[in-house]
Structure formats: C-alpha cells, structure tokens
A protein has these predicted regions:
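Flavin-dependent oxidoreductase catalytic cores
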Residues: 1-381, 385-401, 406-409, 413-415
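N-terminal glycine-rich dinucleotide-binding loop that anchors FAD/FMN and/or NAD(P) in oxidoreductases
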Residues: 333, 338, 416-445
C-alpha cells in the first residue's frame, strides 16, 4: 500500500484523468526568451513529466505585446509561435505527462513603458506609470486571452491556466486598490469581476469542453484594498459557471510585504485559505506555497484542505520527486529549502533560473551525466555542499570517490546556516546528501 494514498490518487476531470494530485506550479525560468529556449524547455518539462508529475503548468506567457514582462518577453498570439511550442508539448506527452500553458498578462507590473492597467495607478515596485485601458482595449484583451488559449490548444497543450492572482492585470481589475474606473469594468464588485469572468467564458467558447481551464484565483491579496473572503467566494462561483475546470488558489500580491514563499514561512502555511473555499464550488481546488515534501502534501489532502497540491520549486530541486514517493524512496528526494537564491533571484537579475540544491535544473541539455567509459579514483577535499554535489554525481557516473573531511560531519558552512532561525530547511540538503552517500557504494567518506 502507498504511503501517500491521497497524493497519488488519480483525479477524474470527466474528459481526461490526471494520474495523481501533483501539479507542477508555474515558474518563469528564463528559457522562454533565450536562443534554443524551446528545445531546452522541452527537455526541462519532459524530465519532470518522466518524474511522475500529474500536470505541469508552464511559466507565464503573455497573450499580447502589452502583457509581456519586458520588451521581447515571451508571448503567444500568432500561429507561428504556436508551432514552436509543439517542441514542448510533444516532449512532455512522449514522457507520459500532461501540460498546460499559463496565460499571464502582467498589467502594471510589466517592466516596459507601454504597460497597461485598469486605471493609471503606478505599482510601488515599478518605475513606470501604466496606461489605463479603454473599454475597447479591455474587449480586445479579453479576445487576446481567448486567442492565446486557442493557440495553446493548437500547439498541443492539454489546457491553460489563466493567471488571475498575485497582483497581475486580472487581479488589478478585481481589486478596488487598483481599479478606479467608473464604467462597466469598475465601481461595484460585480463590475470589477466582469473582466475575469468574461475571459474564462470566452476562453471556454474558444477551446470547447474537452480542454482544461485552470483559473488562478487570489484568495488572499495581503494588500490594502484587496478582496474580502466573501467577495472571493462570489468570484469563484462565477468562474466555475463561466467554465473553469479547476481553481488554483493564489496568495499575496508581489508588492505585499508579507512573506509567502520564503524559507522562514512555515510549511503549508496557507492551505487553510484554500479550505475556506471548499464546499462553495464543485470544481477541484489547488493549494500551494511552501509544500515541499510528500508527507506534507499527503497531510494537506488527507485533512481536506484541497484536491490538488501545487509544487513549483520542489520540482526544480528534484525532477523525480513524485516517482521517488511512488517507489517508497521519499528519503532520497532532494528537498527544496525555499532559499530562492538561484530561482527567483536569478530571474529578477535577468538570468536563467536554476536551483541552489540542483544546479542541473534548466540545464538538462547541457549537463548530461552518462556513465563514464573509464572509472577513475577521485579525491574530493571537503564535504561542503559543492564537494558533496560533485562527489555524488561523479560516483553515479561510475567513478570511485573518496571524500576527505576534517570535521566529524558533512555540510561545511551549511551547518552554520541551518542554525539560523528560519533556516531550518537547510537540514534537508544535508539529509539528502547523507542518504546519497549511504546508498552509493562508490563513495568513501574519511
């Protein structure tokens, strides 16, 4: 019997079935804009599909020019672009997975001078004041979302996720904080939620019934002038009526000052918010944020907080997270420690994302570790994270590795870092390497 019966249970959506309750959450990784990026994304996502993820969601792709994060950012609004995405969908399907494209219009968070919003109110984290969309432009933006979804379907995606959370354009229409309009798209709450409802309704019309539509709903804005719980529930019901297959629950705007994914945030700290929506809608609910072990994911599902667990960064840290859980090898999972140093920090610095504990992430086409034709005897001086990482990869390739460590424990300066309040997750990396050494006969620690 599985140790994770809820997590590994299939989910019947009527027209299709997800093989388990694990969703790889959306992350922009920077491959979307680089030369050869589609081939690299294909390898990146395919490896996670082979690792057992039930449904993958891509990084955010804009439905038009105004919604890109920066000039030259990734978008999908022409058939020629859809053809490129077929590299990704074919690779994922060949690996036995399913994948949805996230449609993200960044609104006033766009870092270019032609950004737009419901009202001309500058974001505190952006130097550029947005242009307020006219009513005609609002209608065109709705059509652009539907067109992007149709192109995603043509490209072979199994569905789309409509990003309505985290303070991006859709969320900006919903919140009184950012919507000061006095037309049909502003004023009353019913008017402010017309934009997301119309996007979902038009998208469903465009793609038909047998296509997954996930709507990412902001459950907790964590900013002044955000939605109340009663308003969120009202919107969720309308989104369900409009045709959403699944609702994903988002937490916090990017300008919010309350941490939501940092390592000091307790595991599964926000699943209680998702549970508030349970019973109000019939579609499956996704919860997320700081769920990084199969044990925690199982607990969240078992207590009825949600139907699906979204894990984004944990899939950077270990592409075979789900497979290891299925095979009773959860102690071999390379756990995400929530440091954000090589994922978010890289993206904010305009670099390709990777992972502090798994530097191969997003470099699957470059770092290909095959068995070495000649086994060598290799000495590694120091059992810090770098030495441990090299030693385990070298041993996996067939080399005989001896690690020389002066202290009585592995980990180097990680042993200092893990003692800092809020950095307890760093223990997980040392646990992972300790287990790797125990299981790898090619490594000797002296």
């Amino acid at each position: 019997m599985s140790n994770y019966p809820h997590l590994l249970a299939p989910l019947d959506l009527g027209f299709t079935t997800l093989k388990n309750r694990v969703l790889m959450g959306s992350m922009h990784v920077g491959l979307e804009e680089v030369q050869g990026g589609y081939e690299r994304m294909a390898a990146f996502y395919a490896e996670r599909a082979a690792g057992g993820v039930g449904l993958i969601v891509t990084g955010g792709i804009s439905p038009n020019d105004h919604g890109v994060t920066f000039f030259g950012g990734s978008k999908l609004d022409h058939l020629e672009e859809a053809e490129k995405h077929k590299f990704i969908t074919k690779a994922v399907h060949d690996a036995g997975g399913k994948i949805a494209l996230q449609i993200l219009h960044t609104g006033r968070y766009s870092y270019h001078p032609e950004n737009v919003a419901p009202s001309a109110i500058q974001a505190p984290i952006n130097p550029t004041k947005p242009h307020a969309l006219t009513s005609a432009e609002v209608h065109q933006t709705i059509a652009d979302f539907a067109n992007c979804a149709k192109l995603s379907q043509i490209a072979g995606y199994d569905g789309v996720e409509i990003m309505g959370s985290e303070g991006y354009l859709i969320n900006e229409f919903i919140a009184a904080r950012t919507n000061h309009r006095d037309d049909e798209w502003g004023g009353s709450y019913e008017n402010r939620i017309r934009f997301p409802i119309e996007i979902v309704r038009r998208t469903r019309q465009e793609v038909g019934e047998n296509f997954i539509i996930i709507y990412r709903l902001s459950m907790l804005d964590l900013v002044e002038g955000g939605s109340t719980l009663e308003e969120v529930i009202q919107l969720a019901k309308e989104i369900e009526k409009a045709g959403a297959t699944i609702i994903n629950t988002g937490i916090g705007w990017h300008e919010a000052r309350i941490p939501t994914i940092a390592t000091k945030v307790p595991r599964a700290a926000f699943t209680w918010v998702t549970k508030k929506l349970k019973g109000s809608v019939k579609v499956p609910l996704i919860t997320s944020n700081r769920i990084n072990t199969p044990e925690m994911a199982e607990h969240v599902l078992a207590q009825g907080d949600a139907d699906i667990i979204s894990m984004a960064r944990p899939m950077l840290a270990d592409s075979h997270f789900v497979l290891k859980a299925e095979q009773g090898r959860a102690d071999e999972i390379n756990t995400c420690i929530g440091c954000n140093q090589a994922c978010l920090d890289h993206i904010f610095s305009m670099k390709i994302a990777t992972c502090l504990v798994n530097p191969r992430a997003c470099y699957e086409t470059e770092l290909i570790f095959k068995e070495s034709p000649v086994a060598k005897n290799i000495a590694v001086i120091g059992a810090g994270p770098a030495g441990l990482s090299f030693a385990t990869y070298a041993a996996d390739r067939g080399h005989k590795v001896t690690i020389f460590e002066a202290s009585n424990q592995i980990g180097g300066q990680f042993n200092i870092a893990k003692t800092i309040p809020g950095k307890e997750e760093f223990y997980e990396t040392l646990r992972y390497f300790k287990r790797k050494i125990e299981l790898q006969p090619n490594i000797k620690l002296v």
